[in-house]
Amino acid sequence: MIKIKNLKKYYGKELVINDVSLEIKKGEIYAIVGHSGAGKSTLLRCINGLENYQEGSLKVFDQEIKDLSQKKSKELRMLRKDIGMIFQNFALMERKNVFENVAMPLRTHYTQCKFHAKLFNKEYMSEKEIAQKVNSLLEIVGLDHKNKSYPRELSGGQKQRVAIARALALNPKILLSDEATSALDPNTTKNILELISKINAEFGITVVLVTHEMDVVKDIAQKALLLEHGQIIGSGAIDELFLRPNAKMKEFLGESDFLPEHGLNIKLYFPKEVAQNSVITHMARTLNIDFNIVWGKIEKLNGKALGNLVININEKDKDKVLDYIEKSGVLWEVAS
């Protein structure tokens, strides 16, 4: 659905997106993560054609965005119809009520005059159909009782729900979210993420999240890409990224391993199918050995509890311990 290969984007002489490649498949929730200035919002704006890029390829629905931006404005407008977007600041019209804000894309894209539709070859939607569509969207986001309210009368979470309804008005296949929860409190953030997950599951909409909030990524993303100074420092499935981070990712996440100098340190990764099993206690009893637990942590990733653990064993027990671990289905590596 979205394929990016060796993408480079410059602002003047400054390289802000540096050789980025990724693929986002239909129906995925994909996070683009980074600190402020990492280039994540710029990358998002390249995806929907709001920013040009100088090198590489960026295809959405198998269409090269650069070609559409430069030569085919009508095709680019049609592509954007299939891409909804929500923002940190909600981007609502303050002088229009909730209903009118959500109806705006429909009234802009469609004509409400059959004569104009025929004369100018435009798509037609009646006011009755618009009202039905808007009311349906407001029901989906839980704001059907607020249709006549104005943005100033809404909480931050309610404003974002209006923005989500508006983004869904033209039945997009992709929903882009640019720091959509960063201005919200934790409880409201949780509710908005649940709504986005529901929309993804029920309508099959591909979701691309730009965020600096790790909890957002862990809550709903299936895959992620981590950017630093416009470069990828990690990408892949969420459990792999957070349970087996590389050195750059550990630095990015502010993590470090403190390990004993004596004995053999083994880091264990518990995939979802064995995360709840008492592998370690069974191993101690079966092999009749002693070992120390150095540290461990459990992460809730996409609603599943996954964990890793570092144990310190005697060097003489290495072969039988590793053989037991292999047979248990637990992933491992010698930590150093």
UniProtKB/Swiss-Prot annotation:
PROSITE patterns hit by this protein: ABC_TRANSPORTER_1 (PS00211), ABC_TRANSPORTER_2 (PS50893), METN (PS51264)
Keyword annotations of the record: Amino-acid transport, ATP-binding, Cell inner membrane, Cell membrane, Membrane, Nucleotide-binding, Translocase, Transport
Localization (cell): Cell inner membrane
Ranges of residues in domain ABC transporter: 2-254
Subunit structure as annotated in this protein's UniProt entry: The complex is composed of two ATP-binding proteins (MetN), two transmembrane proteins (MetI) and a solute-binding protein (MetQ).
Purpose of the protein: Part of the ABC transporter complex MetNIQ involved in methionine import. Responsible for energy coupling to the transport system.
The protein's name: Methionine import ATP-binding protein MetN
Gene from which this protein is expressed: metN
